[in-house]
Structure formats: structure tokens, C-alpha cells
Amino acid sequence: MQMIKKMVLSETFPGILLIFFTFLALLCKNSSLSVIYTDFFHANFTVGFDHFQISKSLDLWINDGLIAIFFLCIGLELKYEILRGQLKNIRAVSLPIFGALGGMITPALIFAAINYSHDFAMKGWAIPTATDIAFAVGILMLLGNKIPTSLKLFLLSLAIFDDLGAIVIIALFYTDQLSALAIIICLFCIFALLLLNYYHITHLSLYVLVGVVLWIAMLKSGVHATLAGVIISLFIPLDTKNKKPYLHEVLKDLNPWVVYFILPLFAFANAGIDIRDMHLGSVFSPVSLGIILGLFLGKQLGVFTFCFIAIKLKLAKLPENIKYGKFYGICILTGIGFTMSLFIDGLAYKNSDIFEHADKLAILIASFLSAIVGFIYLKIVK
């Protein structure tokens, strides 16, 4: 019993759990359990009453709702580090920003260079720009204490900026229309959160209430609802009026739910991709090559190059006691596009099968390559 408890509480267990549910989802989707698996996550659940109802399939409740809590946790951690931790220095916080820019621009250029002559294919230029923060964090958790906190923080920070960039891309290029009324409600909610923070109110129920309204408004606005989690994290106070830690207490309460429930459930709901009708030969099509080269090579090269240039120009600085070799390993992990890339793929091609699922297969290949190569590289390099 003691051994089981020790294993569950270890740093690597959440990562193992995430990988387990990823492969379980693939197994379910590619076996006789496929129909049960699909029906389960596509089952509709309605919350609300009378005219105030939200009806969504279970997988969307997970992707739009529960993952917002994950982003809340990441935002809280990032806020603490910027205000009191290792990112207090402007040059330290600018490093992941430059990395995120490089990680979006370079893959998009690679994809465009390969697919520029095909108008419909070019709709997917943003597919290789995404990083799946949940799975990247899962790989880091597998490595445990082999990865310094500063590098974990860099990946978390970069992934947040990367996802904010993805949300902007989705809003500008893949959203049919934005709801002005919903956006106005979002702004009112943000103002309410600002007041709560200004008056140093630490009643969590008030933040939850405003946060839920913000999440619903964001859901209706056309902007990705997970952004609500990041916004809420900006306004939760660091301390109580008596100078007792508050933000860390919230984070400590939420963290077990995120690593042991939300992330494994997210993996199980999203990793189920049917690969039975996919042909390996299709990976040599222009769209597939654009995605694979963009995600696997473009992400790591873009992140590293932009960061390296920023450091040399003294616009940013490498985390203390970190060598470029170890830093490059983290850059490799940013190529895990997986669910975020699949999400953008669905928006770009509207679930069209014109490419015979070669686009989805390419995302899987590039993401697994980035995960495996990044993991092995970080295990070897000191």
C-alpha cells in the first residue's frame, strides 16, 4: 500500500497516467469498442434551465470547460513567477514570448513554402503553429526532477503565449462571426474581476461566479472559451489582506484535480483517432509534409533560433545554470501539436476528407516524433 501511495505521489506518475490514457483512447477507437467510445464522448449533456441552457457533447464540455481550469492553473503559476519568482526580470519573461513567436512564424512559413500552389491546402497554414500544452507538460512530468524548474517554467510560459497566439489566429482567420453582445459581457466580467482584485477580495466563490459568466460569454462570443481560465488567473490576488499566501493555496487545491483527473480525461477524450483507413504513403503528400516538417522541425528550430537571437541581442536571457543543449530539448517538445493542431485542422478543412485523413495522420506522426525524440534527448543530454 505504501509503495502504491509513493508511486501515485511521484512526479512522474501524472505523466504516465496521461500517456496511458492516450494509448487507451487509440486502442478503443481502433477496435470493436470504437462505436461505444465515440457515442460516449459525443453524447449530449445540457446544463441550465428554461431559455438559459448550454447543450454540448461530452468531449466539448471537456475541451471547452475542464481545460479552462487547466489554463487557470497555468496562468496562476505564471503570474506568481512573473511577480515574485524566476520571471521577475523583463528579459526572463521576454524569452518565452520570443520563443512563441518563432514557434508560430517558422512552421507557418515551412507549410506555406510546400503548399503555396494549392489554395485549399493553404487554409491549414496554422496547423503546425500550435503546441499541445497538456501533452508537453505530460512528457515533462515523465522526466520528473531531471528537468530544472526554470526549464519547466519556460515551457509552460511559452505554451501559454503560444496558445494565446493560437486563439488570436482562430479568432482572426477561422471564426465565421464574433458576437458583439457576448464580447461586451466578457468586458463587464473582466471589469468585475478587476474590482475584486483592487479591493483585495479573497472569497473564491465570487471569482468562481464571475468566472462562470465570463466562460459562458466567451463560449458564445466565438473566441475560444479556455481563454477565460487565463483571464481569471490574472485577477486572483497573490496574498490575503493579512499578507497570507492566497494564490498558492488556490493552486494547491486545484493542482491534484488537474493532474489526476482533468488531463487524463482530456487525453482519453481527444487521442481517439481512427487510423485504420490511413495509408502511410499519404505522409508524402504536400499537406502532410507541410504539417510534419512544420511541427517537428519548424517548431523546434523556430523557438530555438528566435530565443538565441533575442539572447544575443540582450533582449532576453537564458535561465540561470542552463546550457543551450538542455534548452534545445525543451524546444523539441514544443512540436507536440496533437489536440490543438487537430482542433485547428478541423476548423481549416471543416472536417473535409479531401486529403483522406493524411492531415490527421501527419499531426499524429509529428507530435509523437516530437514527444519521443524530445524525451530521449532530455534523458541523455546533461
Curated annotation (Swiss-Prot):
Residues that span the membrane, as ranges: 7-27, 58-78, 94-114, 124-144, 153-173, 178-198, 199-219, 255-275, 291-311, 327-347, 361-381
Keyword Ion transport among record annotations: yes
Reactions it catalyzes: Na(+)(in) + 2 H(+)(out) = Na(+)(out) + 2 H(+)(in)
The keyword Membrane is annotated on this UniProt entry: yes
GO molecular function: sodium:proton antiporter activity
Subcellular location: Cell inner membrane
Predominant place of localization: membrane
GO cellular component, one term: plasma membrane
GO annotation (BP), single: regulation of pH
Protein's membrane topology: Multi-pass membrane protein
Protein name: Na(+)/H(+) antiporter NhaA 2
Name of the encoding gene: nhaA2
